[in-house]
């Protein structure tokens, strides 16, 4: 995924990786680390907080919205299931003039309720809708399990 993001932004001087808390932000940190090893692009890491029970509540970011202006932004989450979290994350950025906007997910479940897609994905997993994908990040091991 890191190489795909790099190739898509090869001419950029700076990109923003916006990770949806909690696991999306951890994944964004890992992508940032990989990008810094393979490119000279300055990476701004940004956390995005979405109330998953009430996604209409205001989305919070740890950087000023003016920093998005005319930048290439990649919104990162761990799992794309129904698309609810990702679509509200996308909505947050629609009020700002961006140079480019892409999405990245580790696991794409293919059960979307909204017209949102992952531009960069680790794996596409077609499962029954009642199954749950759990992503666990740790210092030694990271894993994805189907429950």
Residue ranges of model-derived segments:
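PRPP-associated nucleotide enzymes
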Residues: 1-147
């Amino acid at each position: 995924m890191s190489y795909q993001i790099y190739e898509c932004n090869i001419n950029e001087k700076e990109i923003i990786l916006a990770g949806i808390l909690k696991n999306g932000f951890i994944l964004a940190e890992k992508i940032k680390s990989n990008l810094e090893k393979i490119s000279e692009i300055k990476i701004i890491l940004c956390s995005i907080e979405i109330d998953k029970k009430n996604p209409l509540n205001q989305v919070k970011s740890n950087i000023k919205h003016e920093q998005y202006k005319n930048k290439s932004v990649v919104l990162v989450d761990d799992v794309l299931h129904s698309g609810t979290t990702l679509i509200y994350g996308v909505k947050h950025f629609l009020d700002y003039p961006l140079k480019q906007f892409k999405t990245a997910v580790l696991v794409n479940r293919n059960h979307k309720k909204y017209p949102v897609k992952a531009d960069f994905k680790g794996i596409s997993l077609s499962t029954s809708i009642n199954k749950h994908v759990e992503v666990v990040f740790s210092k030694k091991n990271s894993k994805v399990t189907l429950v």
